[in-house]
Amino acid sequence: MNPVTKQFQFGQSTVTLETGRIARQATGAVLVTMDDVSVLVTVVGAKSPAEGRDFFPLSVHYQEKTYAAGRIPGGFFKREGRPSEKETLTSRLIDRPIRPLFPEGFMNEVQVVCTVVSTNKKSDPDIAAMIGTSAALAISGIPFAGPIGAARVGFHPEIGYILNPTYEQLQSSSLDMVVAGTEDAVLMVESEADELTEDQMLGAVLFAHDEFQAVIRAVKELAAEAGKPAWDWKAPAENTVLVNAIKAELGEAISQAYTITIKQDRYNRLGELRDQAVALFAGEEEGKFPASEVKDVFGLLEYRTVRENIVNGKPRIDGRDTRTVRPLRIEVGVLGKTHGSALFTRGETQALVVATLGTARDAQLLDTLEGERKDAFMLHYNFPPFSVGECGRMGSPGRREIGHGRLARRGVAAMLPTQDEFPYTIRVVSEITESNGSSSMASVCGASLALMDAGVPVKAPVAGIAMGLVKEGEKFAVLTDILGDEDHLGDMDFKVAGTDKGVTALQMDIKINGITEEIMEIALGQALEARLNILGQMNQVIAKPRAELSENAPTMLQMKIDSDKIRDVIGKGGATIRGICEETKASIDIEDDGSVKIYGETKEAAEAAKLRVLAITAEAEIGKIYVGKVERIVDFGAFVNILPGKDGLVHISQISDKRIDKVTDVLQEGQEVKVLVLDVDNRGRIKLSIKDVAAAEASGV
């Protein structure tokens, strides 16, 4: 096919979509160029599903090639390796808005690969990758209810909303939000903010939706000209005979099971009913159905039962109404030897969160397309299988854990002190010990508590809450503090973190069309009500950071030295600073401007190291008495060391009031003596006196 190109204006950026020149064997391939950022997006769809598959195997892989920024990878192998955290998060960002647009019952494998092939280092390539994904799917012929558009939004109080801000603009922005959706609906929001109001956050979502209509129009034009024929695929018809049979036999029992408030008891009862359904209706004889189909229909009845109960105003699975937060239990200081810890329990969701303080050299080194940089704040989220009563894989974190950790980090990051205010590296780890919905928001609450327990001067406590939605026709119910089942069976996952003043993080995933501005306003309003409730209970346990850092945390001292003295402190080949660190058991970081940070496991170690640095950088003061050591004797006097690296000369005439024939008659090498500084010339040479010490002491020097 001949190459086809579409160009359009997207805010301040010129975007070009090109297909038919590169990756022509893929089901769909588009090279998207947004200013100087180019991303190649390919989509491949299997023509038939694998035998026995009962799920939709969609995978999205976003990869940043270092050649795109004119760099060679670091490390020994000099080639790209496993996905970075940034690549994993962007893969999830692309996956979330497209997944709900594939039709129900579509089980063919689909793989999306987004490769950053050129970048200007000024803007994040993620928006270009999302636009390219939309275009590649639109031209592929694969069943897909798109296209989608995507935009990043910043906010400045004086300027207002900013479309697709650059990295530089984001530095002064109070908001970093990515929004994706179709022509009629918003499907995904990912954001972090500096205590913006609910109205400002909603305004940003609507602003993005209006702006990315230009993307959707351009993708439709490209698909009209270069799109492949739509696949001849039809959704499998619902087996109404089996649905009615299971409902008649077990429908009431399923409804009763969903009144059991204890999660494991409820799951056990539903498991028994599912086994009964298989025993009754599965088999190979006539009038029977495959066991997998029976289980699918049983799951469909669960889905309908829970949703009908909720939209008709009946109590939720655990007996709550739509606005009630589950009972909270909040503890801090639960682990004796850690720097800060908290145990946050909300119903059957529990997070054990630990804060650890480290030195500047403990910061995470990030190798990005823009170059290397350090990150002094880390939040790691772990979700072991025992948290849901299961056996499972243990090992390195998966995509979900990385994504949840980043969301929790977004929630608390805006409230952290600056590096100048608090020059420690901070690592927070959230161990999910029980899970039944909204463990990421439990991590936000636990992180805030653990940081305050550690004495980190956060600006304000932060809490988070997860909201849900069930919508059937014109009826809908917004749910506060959703359970795991409500998340799975609902139409929206809406997570909000913030302080009592405003929102710090907002994440939204919507599975259906028809989410109106009214519904989002209600969800944000209920989330605010719940957040203030949780903050009130957290404040009863710990309302502000502890006045002192934990005694287990390293002591950090700061000082400033003349930049000319840096080499003296470091010494030849680093010998001096290494000796100080080995002797005092402290660590020392020196910046080019002379800023010195000293970290010690104890206060005594840090103070000892500081005294050594002060001694090295000190200047000899005229008229001051020092106790020094005779380093070298010459015919005309003796050289005495009075400060580290600083020797002065005591001329033979300045040793004693009496006449001396030989210096060695009075002084010996290694002898300690008191000396008075007489003068320091412009070359730094120090003149000392021993004979004038007594008179100087008598005069009070």
Curated annotation (Swiss-Prot):
The organism's place on the tree of life at top rank: Bacteria
Sequence similarity: Belongs to the polyribonucleotide nucleotidyltransferase family.
E.C. number(s) listed in UniProt: 2.7.7.8
Q: Can you supply a Gene Ontology BP term from the record?
A: RNA catabolic process
Cell cycle as UniProt keyword: no
Matches recorded under PROSITE patterns:
KH_TYPE_1, S1
Cysteine disulfide partners in this protein: none
Quote the protein name from its UniProt record: Polyribonucleotide nucleotidyltransferase
Give the GO molecular function terms.
Answer: 3'-5'-RNA exonuclease activity; magnesium ion binding; polyribonucleotide nucleotidyltransferase activity; RNA binding
According to UniProt, the reaction catalysed is: RNA(n+1) + phosphate = RNA(n) + a ribonucleoside 5'-diphosphate
| Biological role stated in the UniProt entry | Involved in mRNA degradation. Catalyzes the phosphorolysis of single-stranded polyribonucleotides processively in the 3'- to 5'-direction.
Keyword check for Magnesium: yes
Q: Where in the cell is it found?
A: Cytoplasm
Q: What is its main location?
A: cytoplasm
Organism source for this protein? Pseudomonas aeruginosa (strain ATCC 15692 / DSM 22644 / CIP 104116 / JCM 14847 / LMG 12228 / 1C / PRS 101 / PAO1)
CDD domains, sorted? KH-I_PNPase, RNase_PH_PNPase_1, RNase_PH_PNPase_2, S1_PNPase
Assembly, in brief, is: Component of the RNA degradosome, which is a multiprotein complex involved in RNA processing and mRNA degradation.
Binding-site residues, Mg(2+): 487, 493
Q: What keywords tag this UniProt record?
A: Cytoplasm, Magnesium, Metal-binding, Nucleotidyltransferase, RNA-binding, Transferase
Q: Where is the S1 motif domain?
A: 623-691
Q: Which residues form the KH domain?
A: 554-613
Tell me which cofactor or cofactors this protein depends on.
Answer: Mg(2+)
- CC annotations in GO: cytosol
